Amino acid sequence: MDIYSGHINKLIEQLSRLPGVGAKSAQRLAFHIINMPQEEVEKLTRTMLDAKANIRYCKECFTLTDKDLCPICANNARDHKTIMVVEHTRDMAAYEKTGKYEGVYHVLHGAISPMLGIGPGDLKIKELILRLEKDVDEVIIATNSSLEGETTAMYLSRLIKPTGIKVTRIASGVPVGGDLEYIDEGTLLRALEGRTQL
């Protein structure tokens, strides 16, 4: 037996489809939205629709942006000869919070995972290799320390090493299986400073 009406159930069901939102959180969000003033709900809806319509990949690093180039790639003060490779935009954001990394990024949008059917062709690896045809001194591989992240790091290392470009891997300190977005800035900074050559 349903406790709530069809519209409430539909809203809860849709919200629970979001990553990290379970049934109870979806219910709390649904009731919060229902109790919001109409103008606020309309503003939230417009903001989500505008974001979906206008956010795309940066043509250089493939992070999410609303312009052709993200603010980092468009910044000439950044070191464009050093590229940090991360799995997701949220990992890039975690390193930016340290305020110490001055290079640019490349977002793969995942990691190699044969168990999930994700191979190199499903990631932005080909685009990374094309970027390396420019004047690049170092590629820092900052994938997660999970099995998939390590597999991706080794694959990239073997692919890039023959080009003569220095390839480094962030140091440990990031727990095995840990997601970078949840690691504090100090640990990320030590991992970056202690990176090792592959």
Predicted regions and their residues:
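Long C-terminal interaction/binding lobes of large macromolecular proteins
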Residues: 129-198
